[in-house]
Amino acid sequence: MKQVVQSYKTGEVTLREMPVPQCGSKRILVKNRHSLVSIGTERMTIELGRKSLLGKAKARPDLVRRVWEKAKQEGLLKTYQEAMGRLDAPTPLGYSCSGVVVESGVAASAFTPGDRVACIGQGFASHADFVSVPPNLACRIPEKVSDEAATFGMLGIIALHGIRRADLSFGSHVTVLGLGLLGLLSVQILQAYGCQVTAMDLDARKVNLAQQLGVSFATIDGDGLQQQVHAVTHGHGADAVLITAASKSREPVDLAIRLSRSRAKIVVVGTADIHPDRNELWQKEVELLVSRAAGPGSLDPLYELEGVDLPIAEVRWTQNRNLQEFLRLVSEERVQLDPLITHRISFSKAEQTYRRLMDGEMQDAVGVVLNYPEQTPIERHLRFPQQKTGPSGKNEVGVGVLGAGLFGKALLLPALAKTAHAKLHTLVTTSGVNAEHSAKRFGFQSCATDETSLWNEEEINAVVALTPHHTHARLVKEAIAHQRPLFLEKPLCVTPEELDELIQLIEKQKRLPIVQVGHNRRFSPHVQQMQKWLQHRVDPLVLQMRVNAGYVPPDHWVHSESEGRSRIVGEMSHFIDLMQALIGSLPVQIHAERVDGNNRSVVNNDNIVALLKFADGSVGSLTYSASGDKGYSREAIEIFFDRKTIRSQDFRKSELYASGKQAFKTMSQEMGYREELQHFIDCVRGKEKPAVSMEETLWSMRTVFGIERALATRETVRLENA
């Protein structure tokens, strides 16, 4: 299939070949018939992408601050590489389309193949032959509404939500500033709801179009508009003003204040500088509001991705119910869309269309609809011409990779591409855009959105999984079933029940494939050096580990029961494994305490202290906190043994104090990513034995769940048979 994407690095817009995205259990797969180009929004996105790095920094100073804080903590080089990786990732364009359902997931049973649907949402309702859309971002198209009309859904509900923010009543007088697509939809909805409407735009053609759509007074003159509003409201002013224009100045807001009555509402639906003269605002006690997207549920992962609806008794107009309402207005001919369509263009000419838009060749454009071919094959595997795949040599290992999130693309995939004897074969992600771009970037031979190719392809000798936590236990089972070596990003699993199932399965195996969990820290040169300093110790040691993890909101996916479960489960095995590597023994007893906060500004289980007793008599304490400053050191280790002390900080500087001081330093953080992947490949080749036994891997997860239990019961937990 083909899809329109933009490089945020260069601003270039291209029509590229992609594998068809996965439908997924909580999605529907839609064959697009039409999609709508949102000229204002998409032009702004492209213009930002075309700016230089300095221009982007000036446009988004908030992101610059975040990058600087990260650089102070993790080093300039690593932060720069991650930032460039984000800029390099292509952005799908488009957020409003219509088509026919071809597949529906088990959790999207409200839709069936053959349904005509309107789809909304950035990153979902894209300009592409096929789109994978969550149910709350789709709606069946009424019989009287054409597919072409339904493609206006997203713009329609942005307008509708902006109107709702004004909290209007029948007969209210509303002035609309800006008669682009958003404004022309707004004036029609307002009239359908019984409001008196006046409007203004600097383009006379759009003013004429508004008049054709029934607006009694529309003008290009701000003074004339002010006189008309004054006249029709008997000198009081408008009850509400909607700003649907796109402007960098404060003039639209200043004009809106002059047009408003006392205690009116100004709603910024488009873009404008919202720093008006305070005295003017104060004189009329006007409310200045901003309308966000398409209504409640917008940008909420639980609503958009998980399909959790908001109860109608509490939230009457979610974005999906807004979409239903907009389509009702269209079906009853209260909103006319055909007059708004100025261009109907074949999807195959999308690239040229964007070029013409940006070059100013389509000044008369209002509604630009892309039309798609009726038939496009569903192809989920895309092969590239042979390209270099990193260092080569004898006994190469064909590697298939599952998943390519931000962490994988920033750290693990670059390391894997440089790993000796690793031949990058196929990259699989659920998103075709991510799969195609990342596969080309790192030198894979092919990309796919179908996982089965990784297990069935004979040329793939090992699988690297960089997927969400809740998928990990299943992938271990797949690896065992196919006897295929697996490198699995931590954790091994997310529940004690999954761990028990894996233990039982492993015990039944006569031959177990290599399963290496991504506990990279034990492979760090700093840890290797600390192990050398510890190798001749005589007595049990005392180890203190501190992790300044950084705050993650309670609604983040890592806290979700269905995906991440908790940060303890998702991250703690890293530090348990590191303790096991440094001490050379397994934990046998656990005591743990957490803070007792409000579980919102402070997530209780993200702020814990765990005390571990090891089988060799050593003790280790782990302080894990999400309440610290991000600019402070993230990780520190102190070890006391045989009248010696080891201190290590952030995998950049390690020191041994023993009648003097020895120091081991590296230029940047060395957390062991390259080394762990090289070790995995060498194990698959039979050149090395696994550094971590399956017993140690399972035990680190047992310890994690033991910490959870100790926190819940506030009792000491004993682990048997260490």
Whereabouts are the PLM-identified features?
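Beta-strand-loop-alpha-helix segment that lines the small-molecule cofactor/substrate pocket
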Residues: 261, 473-519
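Mid-domain Rossmann-like dinucleotide-binding core that forms the NAD(H)/NADP(H) cofactor-binding site
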Residues: 123, 146-223, 227
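C-terminal capping/lid region of NAD(P)-dependent oxidoreductase domains
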Residues: 4, 231, 235, 240-242, ...
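Predominantly a Rossmann-like dinucleotide-binding segment in NAD(P)-dependent oxidoreductases
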Residues: 297-314, 512-513, 521-601, 714
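Contiguous beta-strand/loop segments that form the cofactor/metal-binding neighborhood of enzyme cores
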Residues: 355, 360-374, 378-381, 570, ...
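Glycine-rich beta-strand-centered segment in the early N-terminal region that forms part
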Residues: 21-37, 45-122, 685
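Rossmann-fold NAD(P)-binding glycine/threonine-rich loop
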Residues: 269-286, 291, 297, 492-514
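N-terminal Rossmann-like dinucleotide-binding module
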Residues: 379-442
